[in-house]
């Protein structure tokens, strides 16, 4: 088998194990984690920038992105703030406790062992 095909298969195995771990350990989907991590990387990000980034990087429909954002907001995993100058503009960020949770999850992922 070619190296590239083998790498894709290995990546899929690792991704499948990560999805299972996120679901069983933290009750979040991989899609929710991707959105959470994009906010984590930016620290504070506008809704438009978040949607655009996910749409172009992950090739997700904006309606899917909106559903995921609503779900993680309802789970209180992110916070949002409306712009004082333009009420239509929303920014997503983490409270101290939310950031601690994401710190914990990302550290756990770094040491997560993948089985062959």
From Swiss-Prot:
Species lineage, top-down?
Bacteria, Bacillati, Bacillota, Bacilli, Bacillales
Write down the DNA-binding region ranges.
51-74
Q: Which family does it belong to?
A: Belongs to the SarA family.
Species name: Staphylococcus aureus (strain NCTC 8325 / PS 47)
List where in the cell it is found: Cytoplasm
Q: Which NCBIfam families match?
A: Staph_reg_Sar (TIGR01889)
**Name of protein:** HTH-type transcriptional regulator SarV
Citing just one GO molecular function, the answer is: DNA binding
Name a biological process GO annotation.
regulation of DNA-templated transcription
